[in-house]
Amino acid sequence: MTDLPDSTRWQLWIVAFGFFMQSLDTTIVNTALPSMAQSLGESPLHMHMVIVSYVLTVAVMLPASGWLADKVGVRNIFFTAIVLFTLGSLFCALSGTLNELLLARALQGVGGAMMVPVGRLTVMKIVPREQYMAAMTFVTLPGQIGPLLGPALGGLLVEYASWHWIFLINIPVGIIGAIATLMLMPNYTMQTRRFDLSGFLLLAVGMAVLTLALDGSKGTGFSPLAIAGLVAVGVVALVLYLLHAQNNNRALFSLKLFRTRTFSLGLAGSFAGRIGSGMLPFMTPVFLQIGLGFSPFHAGLMMIPMVLGSMGMKRIVVQVVNRFGYRWVLVATTLGLSLVTLLFMTTALLGWYYVLPFVLFLQGMVNSTRFSSMNTLTLKDLPDNLASSGNSLLSMIMQLSMSIGVTIAGLLLGLFGSQHVSVDSGTTQTVFMYTWLSMAFIIALPAFVFARVPSDTHQNVAISRRKRSAQ
């Protein structure tokens, strides 16, 4: 990329900066949840909603981000994304109640939903096609560093300052990024078709209401009748979307996508698989602090091996899938992740803390292999005219399933324990043990879906063709 103009290189730095902000925020909060609960006077069992409110908002807003960028311009939308994300961070730091914090996190989610996809679109527009891969590698590298720094930085700030600082650090960075975007980024626009507002609203209502019903089934004071009503509204909204999208060329997501068998299997497996694996980043630091008595900083440091394992496997995952095939790799990694989850719980409860970094490193390797394989299986056989729509739907499903996973983890903690748990007590460890066993079972279930993937020994080379759009 050395032959690119200076202005283009600065624009790539701005996009990389946005990727870093968004990826850092997805992990920095996890280690702070117990301290947030204590400060806000809430049970730690309710704090999963701090993650869910952000991730669910991202899932809901993702389908609109690309259309908005084409309609209004990439600079305007990227600037708006940074401003909303920064304002959300400020309101998070100022929150005095859990409900205020959840609303502020939702505002952050609106910004986060636009930041990454619009950043990808910007790179596509400002960089020559032959240099696209090199440019994307450059701008996504900070996005890989964010998860590495996030847990430890979050723990450090909580332990030596307060949880408010995990949000306050975004403010000066966001101001600089917003100013740089206005000064340096071009405002590309494109001819757009009419936005499928009806489909967008139906999907948004369906996802939000069903997640709320799932969370409301334990400990929120919702009556059974209210929960049944929420479920009914959510199901009706999704059914109406299917009817709306049938034979509708302007639908948000075409139902023609599901004519491709690998897409249908990959999407179903990704949805189920990320429900299970989405529990782990939330549960691990909470378990280390509340279940085992680790300090926030120590718990954050323990997450680094998992990220390193994940980054290490990205270099060889293509060769692994080409050698063994999607079906074998996905079934093996799904069952393997379930076993590693049990191994983590066992070694932790036995007090073998020196083994935990190695177990978490292994967990990161297995999880990364499964994620990359799920993404590429889902997209690799789609025709070119459906590839963009399929990638957008996969991105939305990824975020939705992660929010559902965190919600289920919170429900399991509430099911097996009381609303008030004490740090490092025998009862609390029993609660976490039952929760961890349930998680391992849920993580293993998608193996039944992946076992239906057809043998594809001659199609695995396609993984490299679609990998770019899936990341």
Curated annotation (Swiss-Prot):
The chain crosses the membrane at residues 12-32, 49-69, 77-97, 102-124, 138-158, 165-185, 197-217, 225-245, 263-283, 286-306, 342-362, 396-416, 431-451. Pfam families: MFS_1. One of its GO terms (cellular component) is plasma membrane. GO terms for molecular function: transmembrane transporter activity. It comes from the Bacteria. It is found in: Cell inner membrane. The keyword Disulfide bond does not apply. It comes from Escherichia coli O81 (strain ED1a). Keywords: Cell inner membrane, Cell membrane, Membrane, Transmembrane, Transmembrane helix, Transport. Its main location: membrane. This is Putative multidrug resistance protein MdtD. CDD domains: MFS_LmrB_MDR_like. Residues 1-11, 70-76, 125-137, 186-196, 246-262, 307-341, 417-430 are periplasmic. Belongs to the major facilitator superfamily. TCR/Tet family. The gene is mdtD. Residues 33-48, 98-101, 159-164, 218-224, 284-285, 363-395, 452-471 are cytoplasmic. It is a multi-pass membrane protein.
